[in-house]
Amino acid sequence: KEATGEPIGISALVKPVGNLTVGIIGLTTPDTPFVTHPKNVVGLTLTDPIERAKSLASYLRPQVDVIIALTHLGIDADRELAAAVPEIDIIIGGHSHTQLEEPVVVGNTYIVQTGEHAKNLGYLKLTLEDGNVVDVLGKLVPVTAEVADHPAATEVVAKWGTELEEKLGQEVGATTVLLDGERANVRTKETNLGDLITDIMRDTVGADLAVNNGGGIRASINAGPITIGDIYTVLPFDNTLVKVEMLGRDLLAALEHSVRLYPEQNGGFLQVSGLEFVFDPSREPGARVTDVIIGGNALELDKTYTVATNDFVAAGGDGYTMFQSATVLVETGEMLRDAVASYVVEEGTIAPQVEGRIVAIE
């Protein structure tokens, strides 16, 4: 907490496991203020995870046999953590959704991660001698239909599933094509689902153009019926539609910010409507966008444009600080997923295509 310097939760704990004592450290990405809605981190300061880990590991090491870091940093940052804090024996990671079939070893530290969406159960067996980890066996157990149901979990799922099934299973329309919301795609390039969503945003609020962070699109929809549940899966966040007014130079800055990390996956990569732009990945970040066309005309730096976006981006989420100086014209309060559902109901059957709105010069 900025005001007191106190942590908002437990940073570490010591837990007896059989005849061993295990220390567990919790670490999250310092990018949190950029990848969540700014209102969620008001009054908080994110400390450097490596420096925090060094302090906690030094404190725990004399008390425990094993130190486990439970992290949400991503595989690359986990490697850096392992190299910087060798006192950590095991890193159980997340954030990058990396599926590690066996542990990655950095020095004497073992890094494991199961992928995403509960597709795998991680199994880890440690062998200790004289208080030191001397061997680790790690593997992934795929969670398939062959895995026996857990009675207590089944009871909970059945209870809530019955209440939700009727609503989420309601068909609102259909698509004749795959709606591409794959993580690797919406974070690096234009997709037909990104086009569809931003078209709906632009039409709903009546803006010149629309932008939506790719990281807010969480799944694809297969060709066939579209249900309310499908739309919730694609757009699980409670983002609402906002219409702002901003200068062309700020819009250009937003597009540069969108492609600054390309070809790396980036949750802030923008899906767009009402504009087309070309960028050159060989150029330095901040100077990659070469052409921008809005409504058939070249972008004018000093011209004012109306932009539809979501409240996360409008508040500066994903590092879009230029939106914080934009003039908010309308805060609709309408959920983005509700706008999408209404559109699909009205259209009945859809078949959006990629239109060449975003072009990378290769």
Task: Report residues per predicted region.
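Acidic, metal/ion-coordinating pockets
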Residues: 1-162, 186-200, 210, 260-263, ...
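Generic signal for short, ordered secondary-structure residues
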Residues: 32, 39, 180, 230-233, ...
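Short, solvent-exposed loop/turn motifs
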Residues: 21, 110, 182-183, 276, ...
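Generic structural detector for well-ordered beta-strands
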Residues: 14-16, 125-127, 178, 245, ...
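Feature captures C-terminal
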Residues: 10-12, 133, 195-362
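Short, compositionally biased low-complexity segments
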Residues: 29-30, 165-176, 227-229, 308-315
